[in-house]
């Protein structure tokens, strides 16, 4: 009886499969090297100081390109400073000209700042807020419309959901005690529903003090690069130093639509210089004006 010839097909298939896997690995390695070379992909750092989940020493930064504007102006870039509350700083959000424009527009109409009474919805004087301010109607002029459109583009919240711009001025010693921007009553949510987010734009630099502080923020907030520049009030929580043109976005509600107690915030007293800012509150629904 003649012996059957050996079948070499299995080994050939195995060899072919190994070659395919090897080729895929080579191609994957090549793609990763390209991504690393162009800075699209980055290698995480294993430094002990940045290993904590809430460590702020490594802050996410992304550049947002200007469209149709002068390239000589400072570029905008984003700094995520906290996840509890969710807060980001948009650097160079406003131009110097826009900051000066809002200040000059508001100056003739400044009055002592008030707070909202939760029972009546009316404005009332309070010792917790010692600044002066005024409101600029939504869509009042071309410059304001451009700023409001920019806020909408950055937050993905329609312009129609925003209240009017509030411009505030703090002189030496003036402050705003920690508070929530969201409401705990039904009266103030009749128009537009709850406040979901706040965009706080800094219209001037402040020599000392005047920080926006989040005393209930979670995380190692003492790790921020500007920690040593903060006042004693500013070191009472996660703080942002006012810088002309920057905008602070923070959310008063979590992604599951519950109110976020870590969004508690205040304005530290101005120690040296003066502070100008503009606030845009954003609602869940359309805010009728």
Swiss-Prot record:
Q: Name one Pfam family in it.
A: 2OG-FeII_Oxy_3
Please state the gene responsible for encoding this protein. Answer: P4H10
Q: What is its EC number?
A: 1.14.11.2
Q: Which residues are glycosylated?
A: 220
Establish whether keyword Transport is in the entry. no
Q: Which family does it belong to?
A: Belongs to the P4HA family.
| Annotated residues for binding of 2-oxoglutarate | 275
- Matches recorded under Gene3D superfamilies: q2cbj1_9rhob like domain
User: What task does this protein carry out?
Assistant: Catalyzes the post-translational formation of 4-hydroxyproline in -Xaa-Pro-Gly- sequences in proline-rich peptide sequences of plant glycoproteins and other proteins. Hydroxyprolines are important constituent of many plant cell wall glycoproteins such as extensins, hydroxyproline-rich glycoproteins, lectins and arabinogalactan proteins.
Query: Which residues does Fe cation bind?
Result: 179, 181, 265
Question: GO cellular-component terms in the record?
Answer: endoplasmic reticulum membrane; Golgi cis cisterna
Name this protein carries in UniProt: Probable prolyl 4-hydroxylase 10
Query: What keywords are assigned to this protein?
Result: Dioxygenase, Endoplasmic reticulum, Glycoprotein, Iron, Membrane, Metal-binding, Oxidoreductase, Signal-anchor, Transmembrane, Transmembrane helix
**Superkingdom per UniProt:** Eukaryota
Q: Does the keyword DNA-binding apply?
A: no
Gene Ontology MF terms in the entry: iron ion binding; L-ascorbic acid binding; procollagen-proline 4-dioxygenase activity
């Amino acid at each position: 009886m003649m012996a059957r010839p050996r079948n070499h097909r299995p080994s050939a298939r195995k060899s072919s499969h190994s070659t395919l896997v090897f080729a895929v690995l080579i191609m994957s390695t090549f793609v990763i090297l390209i991504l690393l070379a162009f800075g699209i992909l980055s290698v995480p750092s294993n430094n002990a100081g940045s290993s904590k989940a809430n460590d702020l020493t490594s802050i996410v930064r992304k550049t947002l390109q200007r469209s149709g504007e002068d390239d000589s102006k400072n570029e905008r870039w984003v700094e995520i400073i906290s996840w509890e509350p969710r807060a980001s700083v948009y650097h160079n959000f406003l131009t110097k000209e826009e900051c000066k424009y809002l200040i000059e527009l508001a100056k003739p109409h400044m009055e002592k700042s008030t707070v909202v009474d939760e029972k009546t919805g009316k404005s009332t004087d309070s010792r917790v807020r010692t600044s002066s301010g005024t409101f600029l109607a939504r869509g009042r002029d071309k410059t304001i419309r451009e700023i409001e459109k920019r806020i909408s583009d950055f937050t993905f919240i329609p312009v129609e959901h925003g209240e009017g711009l509030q411009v505030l001025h703090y002189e030496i010693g003036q402050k705003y005690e920690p508070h929530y921007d969201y409401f705990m009553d039904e009266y103030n949510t009749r128009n537009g529903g709850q406040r979901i987010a706040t965009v706080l734009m800094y219209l001037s630099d402040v020599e000392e003090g005047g920080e926006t502080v989040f005393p209930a923020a979670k995380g190692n907030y003492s790790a921020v690069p500007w920690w040593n520049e903060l006042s004693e009030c500013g070191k009472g929580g996660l703080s942002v130093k006012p810088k002309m043109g920057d905008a602070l976005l923070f959310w008063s509600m979590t992604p599951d639509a519950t109110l976020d107690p870590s969004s508690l915030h205040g304005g530290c007293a101005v120690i040296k210089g003066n502070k100008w800012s503009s606030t845009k509150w954003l609602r869940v629904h359309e805010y009728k004006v």
